[in-house]
């Protein structure tokens, strides 16, 4: 009792979860040490051995759990306790029956998302090195199931891979609905699943759920950190498509700007089917609606003040003398100048739409204001179509195949050789995920799915084509995007 009191005082300074963990460990060790002494020949034996087995199971110490369960069976003739002991042994046997070298894979290989599933599978196959496998070389096995992009198929796939194929872990799925359904089932069956989806909050489904994919919130946070923190842009405009994608990124960007102390000066949406964006752009710079007289007067005063500071930029004072009221009337009839009170413009749309939108800005007398975008901008076609209008644009990316990294270069060359096409982010992500898991299996210390889960958290020595991969305590990959900028006719990594 005195030892337990001392332990309680010691644990009081820690967070509740650590104090509980410490207490459980202490009790387990104490019970294990004195079990024979206190349990021999009395009615408490089954209770003690059952508690020991339960604690060891929770700690994933299966050898000790098995020993305690067998002691439980031997300690009593009562059928109730014997049955509990056998159930524990069956559970241990089931946990140890997984195939540590076998990985399950859930991808949409048919249906509307098949093209994305196939690209991901290409990367996974390349990562398994199936094209250069030497005879007799140890390798992991991949069991693939087609989700068809449907949540129901994803759930069935998890059940089959976990209960029948007995895989150690699962990669996938890709699509949002399939991923959330598969994650919930994987958590229920206590099998690690590394999802490849952008779905926010998916790792909240449980401790067995991981994600290896760049999520929008991290991408925008990185973009704003560069724009506000380093380039010192402060004022922003947002021009976004009236779609779920556009609205999502508009809100994400706006929230991020607010959090970092920036300002949103203009926000306009457009119909995704539009090809003329003059109205929206004019609204952003005060050219669409009649200007109040107070604003007109303020702009005139600003213009006079600027002329006094920079007289060489103003008109010759002798010019127009003698024209009197005619000159003033002509000045009033001139098209007003745009009010560009922002330092950058954020457009969350794909490269095809951006190529249509960008030329409208100089056409409406808006020059030298850089664009910010999303990873959907990443295409050489954007530069081919509208390169002159998107110079200095910045956007995040999860993978840059033109990187000078040897790791990336070798991956791109191997992918082209085997698939006769260039890899994208999905192929790169699939490649890195399977390589990461291969390295875990190669360590040879994994016996159960819980072991595998713990190794995922602890492994921090993998550098792949999408960057360094480690996972935080919530199962989210800790990986920053690269920021790309357009200079001349090429994309470059922003230093």
Annotate the PLM regions.
Residues 9-28, 32:
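An internal, amphipathic alpha-helical element
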